[in-house]
Curated annotation (Swiss-Prot):
Produces ATP from ADP in the presence of a proton gradient across the membrane. CDD domains: F1-ATPase_delta. This is ATP synthase epsilon chain. GO terms for molecular function: ATP binding; proton-transporting ATP synthase activity, rotational mechanism. It comes from the Bacteria. One of its GO terms (cellular component) is plasma membrane. InterPro entries: ATP_synth_F1_dsu/esu, ATP_synth_F1_dsu/esu_N, ATPsynth_dsu/esu_N.
Length: 132
C-alpha cells in the first residue's frame, strides 16, 4: 500500500514524523482524509482529533487548531497545541475550557461567532476524549 510522509509539530515539540497510509484531519470547513497523492491544499484546523494510520497502527492526537499543508507525497500539520489523546487529562481539559470561555466572553462583536464556534468545537472534542 502506498504511503506518505506525515509530520505533526507544535510550538512545544515535534509529535510525529512517520510514513502513513492516511491522515484524518479536523478541518475548519469539515473533516477530510488525506492519502498518498492527494491534491495539494492548505487548510485551517479546528479543535478536534487528528488520526493517522500506517504500519505502526492507528494513532490519535488532540489539536486545538493550526494549519494542514497537504502536498501529494506528504502532509504536514502545524498545530497551535497538540498532544496524543492519551495525554489529555482532566486538568488540561479544565485549563483549555477556561481559556476558551475567557476568550469567548472577551471577543468583540465581529469575533463573537468565531469564538463561540471554537468553544463549541473544543468542548465537544474534549468531552468525547475524556468521556464527560
Amino acid at each position: 500500500m502506498a504511503t506518505m510522509q506525515f509530520d505533526l509539530v507544535s510550538p512545544e515539540r515535534r509529535l510525529a514524523s512517520m510514513e502513513v497510509t492516511e491522515v484524518q484531519i479536523p478541518g475548519a470547513d469539515g473533516d477530510l482524509t488525506a492519502m498518498p497523492d492527494h491534491s495539494p491544499m492548505i487548510t485551517t484546523l479546528r479543535p478536534g482529533v487528528l488520526k493517522v494510520s500506517g504500519a505502526e497502527g492507528e494513532k490519535s492526537y488532540f489539536v486545538t487548531g493550526g494549519f494542514a499543508d497537504i502536498a501529494g507525497p506528504s502532509a504536514t500539520i502545524l498545530a497551535e497545541r497538540a498532544m496524543p489523546v492519551e495525554e489529555v487529562t482532566g486538568e488540561i481539559v479544565e485549563e483549555l475550557i477556561k481559556a476558551s470561555e475567557e476568550q469567548k466572553s472577551a471577543a468583540s462583536d465581529g469575533a463573537a461567532d468565531a469564538a463561540a464556534k471554537y468553544h463549541a468545537d473544543l468542548t465537544m472534542t474534549l468531552d468525547a476524549i475524556v468521556g464527560r
